[in-house]
Amino acid sequence: MHSKYNQRLREQGMDIDAIVNFINRNNEFHTKHFSKEYNLALTSAFEHFTAMLAEIFFVEKRTMANADPKLRAMMAWHAVEEMEHKAVAYDVMQKVAKVGYFKRCLAMAHVTLFLSYLTIRFTNRLLKNDGIPFGRRMWMMAKCRWWLFGYKGIISSHLGTLFAYFKPGFHPWQQEAIHNYDAWVEAYERTGDPMIAGAALYQAAH
């Protein structure tokens, strides 16, 4: 799915290879310069973050309201997948690698800063590929900050999910799946159609 999605972006003129190469270089850097335990802690933190993004995308209609139905269905599939395996890396980190509290929290802080940087960097690149001038790109990204981080913003409304990771004794399954998760499961089991399941997840959102 990821390869097909990236190819579709290439066909639309997006410089997706620069993004993929940047990610691959960063993965190689982390593998070379950090311990296996810390890399596992980073993986666990990434999994928690992506599970939180699944919540952000689909717990309320406003986030995906203007998305193409096919894109929304793909993102719904990915969101459900992230929610269902969100504890796997965490359990390996805790039970096998025996990563301690400090390293776990450090990895989450690392991931939060890194993903924030990537969001700005890649959004700017893709907008540039669309031919949008620099000044307008900066204005567009500045204008959306309130939508993301302001009062009842898309991200600020879910910071509790993120910060819960820093609690001693935390486990991902202490946080329940979003309220409309069962709507996706029921629709997919009944029809086998990700488009119908994605629509069901979206329609059941607040």
Regions found by a protein language model. Name each.
Residues 1-206:
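Non-heme di-metal
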